[in-house]
From Swiss-Prot:
Quaternary structure (record): Homodimer.
Organism from which the protein derives: Lactiplantibacillus plantarum (strain ATCC BAA-793 / NCIMB 8826 / WCFS1) (Lactobacillus plantarum)
Matching PANTHER family: 3-DEHYDROQUINATE DEHYDRATASE
Pfam families: DHquinase_I
Protein name (Swiss-Prot/TrEMBL): 3-dehydroquinate dehydratase
Binding sites annotated in the UniProt record for 3-dehydroquinate: 47-49, 83, 213, 232, 236
Active site: 144 (proton donor/acceptor), 171 (schiff-base intermediate with substrate)
Stored InterPro entries: Aldolase_TIM, DHquinase_I, Type-I_3-dehydroquinase
Originating gene: aroD
NCBIfam families (UniProt xref): aroD
């Protein structure tokens, strides 16, 4: 039985998947404006995609924006993510720049969770995980394949590697080219749920993979990404639709 991970006032890995929505504003005004419909919708988690923020490489602007966002969100959990260009994000950074950004986020004291991409310099990954834990910040370690769906064993291997590197939650997103690819992702998720000591988040992207965003309670993914406004990845479903669909599919 995987332990549930406490994230502000929710738990990841217990019962039904929690719901996250992205904020992708490019300015602080855009970011704060996005919180109005989000507060009305009340997701469990907000993912702030800082790679969209035009001042992301300015440490003081980043910390100020994060602190204002934290205040605006009230008690909704905040996950802060810089998605690199190579994994589907907006900006290409060197490893040094990437980890400096992660450190700035931690120093800002505004986030409940930090996304850490697994496939960077291994020592630097371990160091940022340790730093996050010192700040009492949950680490969601991730890998995204926008071209294909690896084999079951490879997906499980990558998720296992994330746990080995100290992830509190391991996340894998893949792109299906066939129905069989979606089944591959779901099979790997079920194996990871049964064998790993930490919760996992998985998704098969695009329209073909939408079913994976509904099936977390059955197969073992603890967080599903929905939309209130702009999507941050292909295949995300509107929160107002996804929430009742998960309710209909709940296990009694």
């Amino acid at each position: 039985m995987q332990p549930a991970i406490k994230l502000r006032n929710i738990e990841l890995g217990s019962c039904r998947p929690k719901l996250a929505v992205p904020i992708t504003g490019t300015t602080i005004n855009d970011i704060l404006a996005a919180t109005t419909p989000i507060l009305a919708a009340q997701p469990d988690v907000v993912e702030w995609r800082i790679d969209f923020f035009k001042d992301v490489t300015n440490p003081e602007q980043l910390k100020s924006a994060g602190q204002q966002l934290r205040q605006a969100l009230g008690d909704i959990a905040l996950l802060t993510t810089f998605r690199t260009k190579g994994e589907g994000g907006e900006l290409a950074l060197s490893d040094t720049e990437y980890f400096k950004l992660c450190e700035t986020v931690l120093d800002g004291g505004f986030t409940d969770a930090l996304d850490v991409e697994r496939y960077h310099d291994e020592q630097a990954v371990k160091q940022i995980v340790a730093a996050a834990h010192e700040h009492q910040v949950v680490v969601i370690m991730s890998n995204h394949d926008f071209d294909k769906t690896p084999a079951v064993a490879e997906i499980v291997k990558r998720l296992t590697s994330m746990v080995d590197y100290g992830a509190d939650v391991a996340k894998m997103a893949v792109m299906p080219q066939s129905v069989e690819d979606v089944l591959t992702l779901l099979t790997a998720t079920n194996i990871a749920r049964q064998t790993l000591p930490q919760p996992v988040i998985t998704m098969s992207m695009g329209d073909l993979g939408k079913v994976s965003r509904l099936a977390g309670e059955v197969f073992g993914s603890c967080l599903s990404f929905a939309t209130v406004g702009a999507a941050s990845a292909p295949g995300q479903i509107a929160l107002e639709n996804l929430r009742p669909e998960l309710e209909d599919l709940k296990l009694n």
